Amino acid sequence: MTKEELYLKTIFCCIACDGNIATEEVDMVRDLCAKDRIFHNLDSEEYLNSWITEINEQGGAFLQTYLKEINSVELNEQEQLLLVSLAIKAIEADNSIEYAEVKFFKRYVQNLL
């Protein structure tokens, strides 16, 4: 997995972890992918559709696998801060912060650091 894919998957997992992917969250992802040079080489729609299929099939196991993936990736401090920033943007995108999102974010940060 490239770092760009990891960044996008981080956003996806943060918007999916509460069991509901809101329209505002999808709009934020599309807007970010269209405007941010980090994602210019990715077919974000293809990745998102694939991950939606996977999370529908695997449920929470998909998120657990992601947490293991970030634990095994070598990231410098700047990349870690970018991931945290992207995660926060994703969680705040629907203007509602759910307990499941806070819980996932805590586990995410523990695995990241």
List each language-model region with its residue ranges:
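Small-residue-enriched hydrophobic alpha-helices in membranes
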Residues: 1-113
